[in-house]
Every structure is written in C-alpha cells, then in structure tokens.
C-alpha cells in the first residue's frame, strides 16, 4: 500500500500517527512513543482492524494499525 499522507502529532507523552493510503478514504491511525520519519510516498505493509472515532458528535470510520512495516 502506498502512503499519500502521514501526520504526526503529540498528545500527552504519545505521538499520534495518521496515515492515508492510496485509493482508500479511511485514515489509518496508530500511536508511538517517539517521533518517526515521514512515510509519505513509501510503500508499507499494514496489519489493521476497523474501528470508529467520535469527532464533534459524529462517528467516523478509522482503521487501527496493529503493525506497520516499510515494504
């Protein structure tokens, strides 16, 4: 899967990572303890499961990443 966008933001002592994949409208999210190099344009292998996130009272579909590895 090819990464089209990768955003990292700090929340408490975690770094929240949001990755968008080519030809997929749903964001893939995961947490890390440290900042990571930008994955934009990289090919990655993902293990994930579907989930939902509540934003401003709306339920949004997200994918929770269990494992991400650069292919």
Question: What are the roles of these predicted feature ranges?
Answer:
Residues 11-25:
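Short, basic/aromatic beta-hairpin or loop at an interaction surface
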Residues 1-13, 67-71:
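Structural detector for short beta-strands of small beta-barrel domains
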Residues 28-30:
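A short, exposed loop/beta-hairpin motif centered on an aromatic-Gly-Thr core
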Residues 15-17, 40-44, 59-64:
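A generic structural signal for short beta-strands and their flanking turns/coil linkers
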Residues 49-71:
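OB-fold/S1-family single-stranded nucleic acid-binding modules
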Residues 32-46:
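Short nucleic-acid-contacting surface segments enriched for D/E, G, S/T with interspersed K/R
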Residues 24-25, 44-51:
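Generic short beta-strand segments
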Residues 4-7, 22-24, 54-55, 66:
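Intrinsically disordered, low-complexity segments enriched in polar/charged residues with Gly/Pro
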């Amino acid at each position: 899967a090819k990464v089209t966008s990768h955003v990292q933001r700090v929340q408490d002592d975690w770094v929240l990572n949001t990755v968008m994949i080519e030809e997929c409208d749903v964001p893939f999210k995961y947490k890390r303890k440290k900042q990571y190099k930008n994955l934009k344009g990289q090919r990655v292998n993902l293990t994930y499961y579907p989930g939902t996130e509540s934003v401003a009272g709306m339920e949004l579909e997200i994918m929770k990443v269990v494992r991400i590895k650069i292919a």
